[in-house]
Amino acid sequence: MQYARRLFKLVGWILLLIVLPLGLGYQVSLYFVPTPQIAVIRIEGDIWGSYTAYVSQALEEAGNDPAVRAVVLEVVSPGGEVSASEGLYFDVLNLREKKPVIVSINEMAASGAYYVACAADQIYAKPGSMVGNIGVISILPSDDLVDE
């Protein structure tokens, strides 16, 4: 009986002095030690002024975040304004100096969107994706012009 009581106390002290601090340290590390992450930034629709500012900010935040180890750009865009596309192109080039940048083309990356994608380290496209030339202009005629 005395032996069992001593053994129980010894096991209790071992748990209290060794296992409990290790468990607490692990739990605390989950909150304070950053885990490696991959940022996913979507470029959807037309590339133009205020939308470009949003994407530029996301690229800058990903570049400055030490937990982010790489960036994936998901592109579904027919392109857009020349100056806006060029701005994003240079933002991606700047980000590429800090971290790997991968582009995933879903459905379409034409004109300015393809220009932005060319700044990445690697480009992946689905087999059915439409990938167009830089500088392509796509205009649908309005109904008024068709009637003439």
Predicted regions, residues:
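Small-residue-centered hinge/linker elements
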Residues: 1-99, 108-148
